[in-house]
Amino acid sequence: MQGTRDVTTKPTVRRSAFAAPIAVSACFFLTVLVFAPGQIYYGNTMDFPMLFAEMLPLLTAAALLGSILLSGTLISLPRGRPREVGISVVFGLALLAWLQGNFLLWQYGLLNGSPIDWASHWTHGLIDASIWCLVLAGALFGSRYVNPIAFWGSVALIVVQASGTALLASRSSDRWINHYSFDQSTRFSFSRDRNVVILVLDTFQSDLFQELLDEDPGIADWLSGFTYFRNATGGFPSTAPSIPLILTGRYYDNAVPFQDFVKSTFKSASLPQTLKAANYHVYYNNLYYWPSLYADPSIASHVLEKTPRWHDAQSRRWASGLMLLGLFRSLPQAGKRVLEGAVARTTPSLAWDDAYGEETLPMGPHARGDARAEGDIAFFRAMTSLSSVAMRTPAFKYYHLWGIHAPLLHDENLRPVTVPYTRENAKRQAKGTFRLLKGYIETLTKLNIYDQSLLLIVADHGTEFQPFRPRLVEVDTRLRTGGSAPPVSTRNSFGLPLVLVKPIAATGAMRVSDAPVSLGDIPRTVTSALGMKSASPGESMFDPGLRPNRPRRVLKYNAEHLHLTSRYFPPLTEYVVSAFSWFDESWQTTGRKFLPGQPPINLQR
């Protein structure tokens, strides 16, 4: 019987001898290379251009390799005290990495390559060092007490972290663009029968076009069939909420998280959804602005289900960067200082990413940090050379370009410049942009699709140029609310976007309209022009029944405080514009303010 007991117990002892080294090694490397990166990812999902699942195989492989090497080293130690101490110390390191990454998180600032002011964090360094020394000393000198709990302690720590990461993932914002890939082959493919094109020139303020028109009346001739809506308002002071307003007609008011608003509005009676349902081929550009857009195969024609790409160079680069950040997060301050240089070199390269291909790069200098990116010039050259009439169904295109957004990139002759962001310099770039636009019109004409196209050339918002003294030839007195002073809108020029619209088959020199319109009217204008029924809010810009004092809504916030990785916007203040939008006298606050996630409050009560 004794022999039988020996036979049955030896394998158990053998498994126990391997179990603890494997468990503590796996716990340590999973903590640093999988769970810490997972917490970073799901705490900042809006910053990562791919799914965590695409990086997880590489993270897991690195953790597995490290676990094999470390557990092999522990197993190779002599039995008894040496192995006992080794297991205890590794378990202590795993515990410390977990504590550091979850409880000893100090605010060192944004990891964007800027130096960290360690001197102001000396107390944090002292706390880190004290805790690490205390735990490691306990693991080293109290190994006989730590070793018996190392196996189950490691298992428990793995389970706790896996559960915590899963919970964080379930609560994190979903970056919809990570789920899809995009077919760019139809970027400039048009229909011979019918096209709807919205061309957004970022920040192109309406009065700049008025000045271009005053100086060169010939613009009205080559903009054949267009109507210039001078009395237009935007909805917001920056791009993010303006794109949904243009494509859905709906205003974001902080009632729900911004990404939830974008997804729900695009999926319910948005212009892309309506046209896709009507058998239009729907294409978006530029996906650099993805936080303000939503697309899936039911809304956009160039969206494809994504094939995971964990093995490509892009995934390897992001996975390695995430592992470095996970290690940085898991180390005490002394270790962080050693890694600071590597982190400073790595994080800027991850800040702007071309993971979705050329079409996601902004029409400006952000791409790869290149301050001389050609932007709109490259777009129009590509459009001129690549456009074709190959679409068998009606086509809808949304192109969002750099316009006159800061920094300014070229002059009126399309030569690259580095100049201050002033009104005069912006006007020079505007002249160059309209040279490009003329070529765009000529291309559509040569393709024999100009007459068959509904074209909108608009801005998403204005800016705060000073002085703001637009030169108006004449303003209907019904569009004034008081006085006869020159038009001045120094406080509200952000809400004055360019709006040019050419209906299908419209001809003749460009005309000027002072009808009270808004960017939120674009969906209804398009569907009305196409003879389609739509649930979009707003009015058709060509409706002759628009009242001269029609109120239009504008929501203002401090754009400098807006971060698209945040769930909500800064507080929004509501205005109503009831007369000609270029006059301060036409702008009135309603007293309503929209705070993040709260019902609106009325400050006038």
Language-model-detected regions and their locations in the chain:
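Catalytic domains that recognize anionic headgroups
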Residues: 3-605
